């Protein structure tokens, strides 16, 4: 069934004056390179070096090697701002013009107070945990103060006990979007219950004085992690906001300014994919009048906005997105009732399909995926929907457990496996639902509680928790796993789930339902999971400005740091094509950018070194 195929075609809006990187002949391109040392003369590896054309919207970033040398890919001629940064050093900046200035070195000077430079995972690790009470409060900060934002945003500031108490008072009356709902519902019970002791803990940890936090920055990137190259594409301010183009003074590019506020007026970037021709597409879940999804030309940075009209006169909002095996882009769309959008990148034509009345709409924290039989799966508030593109029909799968004394199992992530089954996460309840393709019925897998935290709870707190009803995803019990978004291995019988509170990836055998848990290093918190063609699981860390890759064959993790502080990515996707470098897409929800990370081999870097030496 398809509704209003013609009536709901996308209205294309093209933003004028989007930055265009010159499409000059390769002969005019230049390789920018240089060396970076400390003020003491030490060669610094793993330093982040970024270049952005004057007036442009695309930033290219590379890292120094073990000798302190860096090599950019060929860049078009023009004027650039170039800056280098590493935690505990002041940001070094300059302006150059290519191809005249092809060599640019930097000397980094130490920074005494570098806390604002730190990513959220380092902030969390620094919280005191000397006593059992400290550990309980640290868990409270980690689980209940990071659901809406990265911990670096709050912990970069200092407040006394009264100040922290005022913040908790506000946040216990805010929903998952950070919107004040104190007039519409009771305060979040877990924050209300622990408010006094939590404020005292935070004042001791991050108060006006010295504070009890012990900061230990992570090692800088090295090896493969230092060979990658990033392109970050900015999405401009919404012109309907009436603000000047230079309104945003901190977008996370200069770490010394700290983590930026999410209140950057613009089009919210949630999920993003590269199409098979290498162009970027992203979803917008922020109310606006102009865009439902957007397209970014990866060569020029030019932005096009596509609008599906909503009944209220705004653009229909969306959240989840996927690219199927044929290259078609699918996304959820709420144009009055949650449906599913289909876009062919070659024609830029959008069709919208709506579930029939009486069936649940797409909804929850909507995630979209495809299965091995070409069907599309999407989150529904109380389960998941499957859409067959051939027959244009929806099939509904309901969660077996939904309303409980401790909360409601609203769906978060969803995925389809190679056998045609669908999967979804009830984040509040630590339950994974399954839509069985063979029987047409729902099943469920219950995740194990974090026993260490369960044992740590006091008897008084346990008594409260027994009757505590979680109002949304982000007010969990201390022992919650918190399954957010997920991904299946399309070449194996494996489902990977990002357990945000449990700090692990749950691995479920899609046929036997056997479940195991793979801890993340340093108790870092996963969000979404994407699986590449080599069976590696990629997960974005929204609170760490990092993406991790897990190799199940060797049980090893590789970390790749993002160039933006406070990026807050909530999705990760991949483009793997024969004979081409693997590209990893990371949409920055907080910083309003889309990043594409390209994996570069040692031979790729050697070729750049050789060319740079012959310029």
Where are these regions (language model features)?
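A short, solvent-exposed loop/turn motif at the edges and junctions
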Residues: 55-57, 79, 83-95
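Extracellular beta-sheet/turn segments enriched in Thr/Pro/Gly and aliphatic residues
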Residues: 98-121
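Beta-rich, blade/repeat-based domains predominating
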Residues: 242-244, 263-276, 311-325, 358-373, ...
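Blade-level signature of beta-propeller repeat domains, shared across WD40, Kelch, NHL, RCC1
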Residues: 563, 567-615
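Conserved beta-strand positions in repeat-built beta-propeller and related beta-rich domains
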Residues: 274-275, 282-287, 329-336, 376-382, ...
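Short, acidic Ser/Thr/Gly-rich low-complexity loop/linker segments typical of extracellular
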Residues: 54-69
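Structural motif
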Residues: 35-44
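The canonical Cys-X-X-Cys-His
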Residues: 141-152, 198
